[in-house]
Swiss-Prot record:
Protein name: DNA replication and repair protein RecF
Keywords: ATP-binding, Cytoplasm, DNA damage, DNA repair, DNA replication, DNA-binding, Nucleotide-binding, SOS response
Origin superkingdom: Bacteria
Entry annotated with the keyword DNA damage: yes
Chain's gene name: recF
Amino acid sequence: MHIEQIKLTNYRNYDALALNFSPKINVFIGENAQGKTNVMESIYVLAMAKSHRTTNDKELIRWDSDYGKIEGAVQKRHGILPIELTITKKGKKGKINHIEQSRLSHYIGQMNVVMFAPEDLNVVKGSPQIRRRFIDMEIGQISPVYLHDLLTFQKVLKQRNHFLKMNQGKSMSNDVMYEVYNEQYIHAATQIIRKRFQFMDLLQEWAEPIHAGISQGKETLIIKYRTVAGIEKEHSSSEIENTLHQKLMEAREREFDRGVTLVGPHRDDLQFLVNGYDVQTYGSQGQQRTTALSLKLAEIELIKQETNETPILLLDDVLSELDDYRQSHLLNTIQGEVQTFVTTTSVEGIHHETMEQAQLFHVKQGAIEKS
């Protein structure tokens, strides 16, 4: 899979922009705050219908416009597929082959991307919220059903939290509505937990040998999905539901005191173990970067396995974060097979062989010149 062309209308600092890309390597060169990351972001947004930089979609729309639009021509195994995402202040609409989709979950997954930016190091060393977002975004690319389940869970969680907030501090010994909300919540939460365990098993299969290769056999990476309810991947759906029910009963008084749900997948986390040690707490900066790189390369392989298409790789100002050895391993792995986009302030430090294959784009004050 590769993207042949992108058109931007009223997106960030661009009122109108059209670019054609190489199916191999595309390098955007320019100083900071010139607009090169906006192009990279637009490719990601076209694929995922959300930004990796902001949760406020209004920021994606050019300041003097009511809407923004991204159009792309994606070369897939069976031909070229036009896709389009329109962003307004009221929401987003996606089109596949010029047909508007009733749900964004039907749109996401038509173009697969793997983004590696400096902030992705936070997947390893940052907050649990970042890691949960990582899981949800990656599963969503390969499973539209998961996106639907996630939206259902978020809706039920919001309703349950509202119920707890409205009854905060009250004694609810035999409340029928409490049981109704619990039943809906437990069912929705179970779907998310099961699919996350399944995804982490698949990711582990790829990440472990990749990490071993980068570390020259010196390190073993184990990824664990940790639930606040103490659920294990071997548990059946009914066992997960029973455990959630038990933990909710135990947390009942605290939940009514605080007016918020304390048990469920919205509070779960990932743990990365290198040679048995938690890399977030005890790992060196080099080990944390190797873990992050292993995850990204594993994502590429997993998406290929599950979709039968090679995803597009976006390297946003990240090569400077990797030493020569890790950069070499990354570029050698993707050489010639994965369409790659790179942003950088200087071509120095990028391998000569990579630059020989690359299509260069010079970015200055929002103007892009192809060379």
